[in-house]
Regions:
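Predominantly the structural core of cysteine protease catalytic domains
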Residues: 1-116, 125-203, 231-235, 250-251
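Short beta-strand segments enriched in hydrophobic/aromatic residues
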Residues: 60-62, 99, 123, 201, ...
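Conserved hydrophobic/aromatic positions in well-ordered beta-strands
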Residues: 96, 211-213, 313
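Short beta-strand-to-coil "C-cap" segments at the C-terminal boundary of structured domains/repeats
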Residues: 150-154, 215, 312-320
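Aromatic- and Gly/Pro-enriched, solvent-exposed loop/edge beta-strand patches characteristic
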Residues: 205-285
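Short, surface-exposed beta-strand/loop patches at domain edges
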Residues: 260-320
């Protein structure tokens, strides 16, 4: 899947700005630091996530554009929706509950079994039951890919973000192996310490090691890396790892963040940004200095050799 988290997802209060315009001066009220991805129509995992973590975002095909639209698949009497066609996804909803016994006879078309998710739409209280409606478990797209936003922090949690992947996870790279190393190089500002790093796990049960190079001269410097964190994540997704002890950065000097990642059952564990299609035509390869390696010894330039940017972010705080 593609998970676009431009810069860092920064929620804002939409009532201040309206729904029909984009305001480049939006003021962030929170920073998203973690999002889990549940794939392959894993309905039980989605239910568990709703129960333990809150609403789960998912995508469907909708033949409606607002609450007043006519629809072949939406039953207004029961506030229920079931699509069994081949059109691709075009609308997001949030799963907030479920009913295993919800009758399949409540839909315009009849699914093979009972059961439905309770979903929150974005079309106001005139739609469905005060904005909520049922979607059959057997809808063509429900839960194909679901996202759980699991870590929101205050907007002042870090002072600066270093990154080259402003479009986020667009594709994957690897060396026909479940493990790989990837790194990004940045130039530090003044009076900064490295507090956290963020990256994508492209599959479940991913283990990681985070290294830092505080004095980067060239790619040979990547061998002088210092282990600063390690762990495992349950699902694919976007994760921020706080360092147990912040690393002081030299003013105006280059530093590197290196990730050693292992993702079972994949040959391409590295998330990258590249020019894939019309949705990513704002891709800028000139803003990054990334490196890729199988075992952390021989390195390739992400930009020169693979025409991509590595999805890896560094967060710093100002030291007084």
């Amino acid at each position: 899947p593609r998970l676009y988290i431009p810069d860092r997802l920064r929620p804002a209060h939409h009532l201040q700005y309206g729904d029909d315009e984009t305001n480049s001066k939006l003021k962030a009220v929170k920073h998203l630091q973690e999002a889990e991805i549940i794939e392959d129509k894993d309905l039980e995992a989605v239910k568990e996530a709703v129960y333990k973590k809150g609403g789960v975002e998912t995508a469907i095909y909708s033949d409606m554009v607002d609450a007043d639209s006519d629809s072949e698949y939406y039953n207004r009497d029961h506030s229920s929706y079931y699509y069994d066609g081949t059109e691709g996804i075009n609308h997001d909803v949030v799963i907030v509950g479920w009913d295993d016994n919800y009758s399949r006879n409540n839909f315009n078309k009849t699914p093979k079994k009972d059961g439905a998710f309770i979903c929150k739409n974005s079309w106001g209280t005139d739609f469905g039951d005060e904005g909520y409606f049922y979607i059959s478990y057997y809808d063509a797209h429900i839960c194909e890919t679901s996202v759980v936003y699991t870590k929101l922090e205050p907007a002042d949690n870090y002072d600066k973000i270093y990154q080259a992947d402003k479009l986020g996870w667009v594709g994957v790279l690897g060396f026909d192996n479940e493990e790989a190393y990837f790194a990004n190089v940045y130039k530090a500002g003044k009076n900064e310490e490295l507090a956290a790093v963020a990256f994508y796990a492209t599959g479940a049960k991913t283990t990681y090691e985070v290294y830092v190079v505080t004095d980067f001269q060239d790619e040979d410097s990547l061998a002088d890396r210092k282990l600063v964190a390690s762990g495992e994540v349950e699902y694919a997704g976007y994760y921020t790892v706080d360092l147990e002890q912040a690393e002081k950065l030299a003013d105006g000097k280059k530093f590197a963040v290196v990730i050693h990642i292992t993702t079972p059952d994949t040959k391409y564990p590295i998330a990258i940004e590249y020019d894939a299609d019309s949705l990513t035509d704002s891709f800028d390869i000139k803003d990054g200095e990334g490196y890729l390696s199988l075992y952390g010894k021989q390195w390739y330039s992400a930009e020169k050799d693979r025409k991509c940017n590595v999805c890896l972010k560094a967060f710093t705080r100002t030291v007084e």
